[in-house]
Amino acid sequence: MSIFFSIRFWPAAISAAILWLPQVLGRSNGTAPNYTVEELWKLETTFWDNFLYPANVEQMEAINSTLFTQDVQGRVDITRVFNGSELNTEYIFGLFSDPDHVSLVGVPVDYSITQFIAQGNIASATTVVTFNATSFGNLLVPVTIDTWIMWDADGRIMQYDATFRWFGFLLDTLVEALAESINGTTSQATASLTQLLATTICATHDQYCTGSNQQYDNNTACLDFLTSAIPLGKDYELGRNTLLCREVHEHMVQYDPALHCPHIGPTGGDYCVDDQTYAQKVLQKYFNQSWIVGVPSTGDIWLGD
C-alpha cells in the first residue's frame, strides 16, 4: 500500500474502526474483560494504524485520544513513564506527526507485526515500524518496538509497556547516515547533530517559552547550555539530563508550554533529570494492574503501592 493511498483512505477507515470497536468487543465480567484473540488482534492493529502518519495527526488534534482511558499508564524503556490520556496523546501521537520538523526518526509510515500472543485483555507484540527520517534525507529506517498492552472493556488502552529494541544501533545508523551526507567523520556528524538539535530546541524555546515559562536568559545561553553543559546522551538516556531527552520534549512544548518548557530548560523539569539509579529504574513500582495472566501475581515487584 502506498503512502499516498494511505493518506486518502486511512482517516475515514480508522475513525470508523474506532467507533465500531467498543460496540462489538468483549465486555467486562466484573473484573477484567475477556477478549478473543481475534478481538485483541483488532485492537492491536487499530492502535498501530493510528500510530502511522498522517492518522496520528488526527489523534493528536483530539487532545485526549479516545484510544486511551483517562488514567492510562504508559512506560517506555528509553524515556520514562507517562500518565493520563492527554500526556500520552502528546507523546505517542504528537511526537511523530510533523515531517517538516527536525526530529530523530521522523514519521512512521508503515508497520509489520512480527510476533503476537494474547489472552484476556492483554496482548504482547513485536512490531517493526518503518520511519521516514525526514531530517536525515528521507532515510527509511525500520524500528523494532516490543509492546505489552492492556485494554479495558470499551477497547481503550489502560496501560502499556514499550521497549525500543536495538535503539543504540539505530542512533549509530542515523549518525553514520549524517556523516555520509556531510562527507565527514562520525565525530563531525555527532557535533553537527548536536548543533542541529540544540538550535531547534532553542528556537522553540524562544517562540513558546515566554514570560513565566522562560527557561534561558537568551538564545546564546540556551545554545551554550545544550551544546556544552550536558551530553548528547546514550541510547537509554532519553529520560535523563541529556540533549536527546530535551529533543523528545521539544516537540511537545507547542501544545502546553507551561508543562513542557521546564523539560527543555536547564532543570529538565521532572523528566530530563538524573534522579534514578539503574536499580531504581529496573525496580520502579508503577503499574496498577499486573501483566501476569492465568496465575497469581503475588510477588510482582512492578505493581504500584
Swiss-Prot record:
Which positions are glycosylated? 29, 34, 64, 83, 132, 183, 218, 288
Domain of life, per UniProt, equals Eukaryota
* Protein role: Part of the gene cluster that mediates the biosynthesis of aurasperone B, a dimeric gamma-naphthopyrone. The first step in the biosynthesis of aurasperone B is the production of gamma-naphthopyrone precursor YWA1 by the non-reducing polyketide synthase albA, via condensation of one acetyl-CoA starter unit with 6 malonyl-CoA units.
Q: Where does this protein come from, organism-wise? A: Aspergillus niger (strain ATCC MYA-4892 / CBS 513.88 / FGSC A1513)
Where does the secretion signal sit in this chain?
A: 1-26
Entry's family note: Belongs to the bfoA family.
Q: Which gene encodes it?
A: aunA
UniProt KW keywords: Glycoprotein, Signal
Identification of the protein by name: Aurasperone B biosynthesis cluster protein A
